């Protein structure tokens, strides 16, 4: 059996998938299988993968009806034969040494997981200026849940992402964890806190993963109501840490981040002219914001001005936003 299973799901990446597959096959670590999951895409990606599979026995192709990224990733989880799993998005590029580096860090540290840094490239593979790299303020061997301290305090998604990690597959299977198929965005991040609990991870800021941002891709769109999945994810994280007093500081940071992300999405929806379309989608998250408002106001060290804005927002979001516009303080 292979030591590592690499899961790559795809729907509409015909221009980039061959480059992604080539980068994986060029890895210096060779004891792996590559699972290509065709999520019922509209173009020839599935046929391309079948052709690629004929050129390298390490490639296994799975075709399925379209069900979203989480359902495709779960096909990979269920069929992986390796001791460790890695995920590579269908339009991204990994360094040849990524698998070797993360595997070595796991073996040397005794951690069941390892993670690296990532940066953003454009459609031609060139570095994109102005995009914050995915790095971590914590390095070396750490409590894996401490990655959420970094995520909540810096905004970096180094911790909650799957694509920059190599993970012992038993952390999924022994706990019965699968990706959340109700989530369109953040399907991997929405479950990793459960994978991390009670575990350690070795973190490095070596840039071994290159994330592609292209016009029209899910993550490049200015605002999409499906992004509100992130608020569900943040709420679940807050509830998770609320039940674990030993992580009280991370809980408080998570509360504050939930409010910041909610307000940011509200701002983006208004700026994109999508608020009328998104009003209904915001409703359950507004209820969560009201539910969390008491500890937010009491425990998170908000300034007097921020407390006033939160109280006004809870009373009348549109009015609070209009006042913020008059003051020139919209997105913070």
Language model region names:
Residues 206-214, 220-249, 260-293:
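Catalytic core of nucleotide-sugar-dependent glycosyltransferases
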Residues 271-332:
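Membrane-interface aromatic/basic loop that binds lipid-linked glycans or pyrophosphate carriers
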Residues 64-80:
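Glycine-rich, basic loop-to-helix element that forms the pyrophosphate-binding segment
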Residues 93-202, 216-225:
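Donor-binding/catalytic cores of nucleotide-activated saccharide
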Residues 22-31:
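Short, acidic, metal-binding catalytic loop of nucleotide-sugar glycosyltransferases
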Residues 1-23:
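N-proximal low-complexity "stem/linker" segments adjacent to membrane-targeting elements
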Residues 85:
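Short aromatic/hydrophobic "clamp" motif used to bind/position activated sugar donors
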Residues 38-48, 89:
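A conserved acidic beta->alpha catalytic loop
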């Amino acid at each position: 059996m292979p030591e590592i299973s690499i899961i790559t799901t795809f729907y509409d990446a015909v221009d980039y998938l061959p480059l992604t597959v080539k980068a994986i096959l060029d890895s210096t670590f060779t004891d792996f299988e590559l699972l290509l999951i065709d999520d019922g895409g509209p173009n020839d990606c599935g046929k391309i993968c079948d052709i690629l599979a004929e050129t390298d026995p390490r490639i296994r192709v799975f075709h399925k009806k379209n069900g979203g990224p989480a359902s495709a990733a779960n096909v990979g989880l269920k069929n992986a034969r390796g001791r460790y799993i890695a995920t590579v998005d269908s339009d991204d590029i990994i360094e040849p040494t990524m698998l070797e580096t993360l595997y070595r860090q796991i073996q040397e540290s005794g951690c069941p997981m390892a993670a690296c840094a990532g940066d953003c490239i454009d459609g031609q593979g060139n570095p994109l200026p102005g995009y914050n790299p995915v790095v971590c303020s914590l390095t070396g061997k750490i409590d894996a849940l401490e990655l959420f301290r970094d995520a909540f305090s810096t905004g970096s998604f180094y911790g909650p992402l799957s694509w920059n990690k190599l993970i012992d597959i038993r952390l999924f299977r022994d706990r019965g964890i699968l990706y959340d198929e109700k989530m369109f965005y953040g399907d991997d991040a929405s479950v990793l806190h459960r994978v991390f609990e009670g575990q350690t991870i070795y973190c490095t800021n070596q840039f071994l993963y290159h994330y592609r941002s292209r016009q029209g891709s899910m993550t490049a769109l200015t605002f999409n109501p499906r992004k509100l999945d992130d608020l569900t994810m943040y709420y679940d994280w807050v509830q998770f840490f609320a039940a674990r007093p030993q992580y009280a500081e991370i809980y408080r940071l998570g509360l504050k981040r939930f409010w910041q992300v909610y307000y940011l999405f509200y701002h983006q929806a208004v700026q994109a002219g999508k608020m009328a379309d998104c009003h209904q989608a915001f409703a359950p998250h507004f209820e969560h914001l009201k539910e969390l408002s008491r500890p937010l106001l009491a425990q998170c060290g908000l300034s007097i001005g921020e407390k006033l804005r939160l109280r006004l927002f809870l009373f009348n979001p549109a009015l609070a936003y209009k006042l913020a516009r008059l003051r020139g303080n919209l997105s913070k």
